Regions:
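Hydrophobic, aromatic-rich membrane-embedded alpha-helical segments
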Residues: 2-9, 147-160
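Interfacial loop-to-transmembrane junctions
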Residues: 127-129, 163-176
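Transmembrane helix-loop-helix
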Residues: 40-51
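Membrane-embedded alpha-helical segments in integral membrane proteins
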Residues: 30-42, 83-87
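Select subsegments of transmembrane alpha-helices in polytopic membrane proteins
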Residues: 21-30, 74
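Membrane-proximal soluble regions of multi-pass membrane proteins
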Residues: 1-24, 174-176
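Functional transmembrane core segments of multi-pass inner-membrane proteins
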Residues: 49, 54-57, 61-156
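Membrane-embedded alpha-helical segments of multi-pass transporters/permeases
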Residues: 37, 41, 89, 111, ...
Length: 176
């Protein structure tokens, strides 16, 4: 990946002004390259691989926007959802019925958790972007993929949240 190599070659500094460049940029590039390579490897040389790589790019963008802003913008989640539904008409990842049920189940499952949490605590536990993202993921994987997505994302989110709380020393007051 050129940005990673140039970052190493320039020792993390701008070629013109010599100001330091955050290590985050090459790490995001490296992560994206690895994730896209994995996606392409899973599907081989097919149109499915191209769609999987595009899907991966959008998910990486959503990941880092969410980390920075605690926001999953509609400008990315909704096109991702509609693209998944559109691709299902050609059975690229799943069929149309599975995609529609997956999108509805994804949205409604987190919507239900949101309202149960809000009724129990009086607080919002997540944003609506989370519902839309899980709906989009359901459109790509069908309802069958949702349990593992929820399980893995809960596990990764818990580990990341604990690490952030420890590193930032904020304890339970930190919103994750």
């Amino acid at each position: 990946n050129v940005p990673v190599i140039s970052y190493l070659f320039l020792k993390g500094k701008c070629a013109k002004c010599k100001v330091g460049i955050s290590v985050r940029y090459p790490l995001v590039e490296l992560f994206t390259a690895l994730a896209c390579t994995f996606a392409a490897y899973q599907f081989g040389v097919t149109s499915q691989a191209l769609w999987a790589v595009l899907f991966t790019y959008i998910l990486v963008a959503l990941l880092f926007i969410d980390l920075d802003k605690m926001l999953l913008p509609d400008q990315l989640t909704l096109p991702l959802l509609w693209l998944g539904l559109l691709l299902s008409t050609q059975h690229i990842f799943v069929g149309t019925t599975d995609a529609i049920i997956g999108a509805a189940a994804g949205y409604l499952s987190l919507w239900s958790v949101y309202w149960l949490f809000k009724l129990a605590t009086g607080k919002e536990g997540m944003g609506y972007g989370d519902f839309k993202l899980l709906a989009a993921l359901g459109a790509y994987t069908g309802w069958q993929g949702l349990p593992i997505i929820i399980l893995l994302s809960s596990f990764v989110g818990a580990i990341a949240g604990i690490l952030i709380m420890v590193i930032q020393n904020k304890g339970k007051s930190l919103a994750i």
